[in-house]
Amino acid sequence: MSEYLVTGGTGFIASYIIKSLLELGHTVRTTVRNPRDEEKVGFLWEFQGAKQRLKILQADLTVEGSFDEAVNGVDGVFHTASPVLVPQDHNIQETLVDPIIKGTTNVMSSCAKSKATLKRIVLTSSCSSIRYRFDATEASPLNESHWSDPEYCKRFNLWYGYAKTLGEREAWRIAEEKGLDLVVVNPSFVVGPLLGPKPTSTLLMILAIAKGLAGEYPNFTVGFVHIDDVVAAHVLAMEEPKASGRIICSSSVAHWSEIIELMRNKYPNYPFENKCSNKEGDNSPHSMDTRKIHELGFGSFKSLPEMFDDCIISFQKKGLL
């Protein structure tokens, strides 16, 4: 069995990866800003094997050298820590762009210091570093060779895509410069059951839309993917020797209006949003090419109804709906 580091342990993707790795028998380290905040980290200790094989360490994405201790001696690093959705009235540079870009640089730099023992790094990037292009529709199906255009992101204020694109580019630069084995997973919009005590950014958006509290639903045409598939893709990226480069992890592409209709038909008692945002730039019809992940042995992706059912049912079980 191996010892792995998963950054940002309380995050949606990270917590599921930790749970899966522990169930597989691995030893896991994870980093959070405050390991003593039981309200946020307590649920991690409930995972099977956590008390015997989980360590929670302190680290900060924006502090250089912060990950040195956590990385030292592990076999592999899953760098998943990243803000996703930040309220528009916040300082985007400070709360979104810097943590993504500086965080990636800091984690990769810590990995370079331990490269004698470190076998592989798996970085969680995003389809947002692929699909934000002026020619997204014409170039579809988009594959691992496509990159988002930072100028497109700036024009339409797509700051998450902007930061993820620059952050991933920086990761590849450092990996090449330092001779690190890097594999990148590019998931689309991740959906599935809530694992932690409170919904995090993407699930919080779905909950607000289901409760009619968002004011409008996003004018997004985006790929969606079940959290179980994202976790499986990360483990495959780490443990499959043939895995390399970027790996798109995405099920169906749909506009949010289709998702609203899907959920409203299944759950007619909830006041789903009726109004679509008029924000432009994130609504280009496109498709994603997932041949690469299937060639590595990945099975079939879960469907839109499965992922949203699992999400809504988890909200119901936790008394949020």
Curated annotation (Swiss-Prot):
Where's it mainly located?
cytoplasm
Knockout or disruption consequences? No visible phenotype under normal growth conditions.
Residues carrying N-acetylserine: S2
- Domain of life, source organism: Eukaryota
Which SUPFAM superfamilies does the entry link to?
NAD(P)-binding Rossmann-fold domains
Similarity remark: Belongs to the NAD(P)-dependent epimerase/dehydratase family. Dihydroflavonol-4-reductase subfamily.
Q: What is this protein called?
A: Tetraketide alpha-pyrone reductase 2
Organism annotation: Arabidopsis thaliana
